[in-house]
């Protein structure tokens, strides 16, 4: 699906995320200068640019890891300040990071549980991990310890963790950079 295709051409357009005039500076360095765009439900977008162009900086602002110096982020038609990754997840924004962060001593299911609301048993979560990884063909064992997994397997854990949050908007910052061609 491209950005111009919609799952149902008869449905009204629904803008999930809009950004207007987003700027971010680090001292004298400008990472983002007057960035603006819209993402509608069902669309797929890619941010393209060379290393250091500000792509990761921008998605970190959308996910609440950084705050813009100026400009506005609009979520589902309402201006919003995304204060933290937790706030982003509460809004329905999920992110798979280029440089992921997993607790090496924990199992896959235990790591995934840390990103989800409390209350679900590890047994039930493990079943959901198995189902999700089977649905997408990415083979994640919920009982495996992270320190026993390859880097590619750890990245697949990150992807499943994000998908299990059922985000309305999924941001992926070079999620396949550590995967082999077969993965």
Where are these regions (language model features)?
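Glycine-rich phosphate-binding loops of nucleotide-dependent enzymes
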Residues: 2-183
């Amino acid at each position: 699906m491209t950005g111009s295709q919609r799952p149902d051409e008869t449905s009204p357009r629904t803008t999930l995320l809009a950004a207007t005039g987003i700027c971010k500076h680090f001292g004298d360095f400008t990472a983002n200068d007057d960035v603006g765009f819209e993402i509608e439900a069902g669309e797929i977008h890619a941010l393209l640019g060379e290393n250091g162009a500000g792509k990761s900086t921008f998605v970190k602002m959308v996910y609440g890891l950084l705050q813009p110096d100026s400009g506005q982020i609009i979520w589902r038609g309402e201006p919003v300040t995304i204060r933290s990754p937790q706030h982003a997840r509460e809004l329905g924004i999920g992110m798979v990071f280029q440089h992921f962060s997993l607790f090496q001593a924990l199992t896959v299911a235990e790591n995934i549980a840390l990103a989800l609301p409390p209350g679900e048993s590890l047994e039930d979560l493990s079943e959901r991990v198995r189902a999700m990884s089977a649905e997408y063909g990415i083979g994640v064992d919920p009982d495996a310890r992270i320190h026993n997994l390859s880097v590619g397997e750890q990245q697949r854990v990150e992807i499943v963790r994000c998908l299990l949050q059922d985000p309305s908007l999924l941001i992926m910052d070079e999620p396949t950079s550590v995967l082999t061609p077969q993965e």
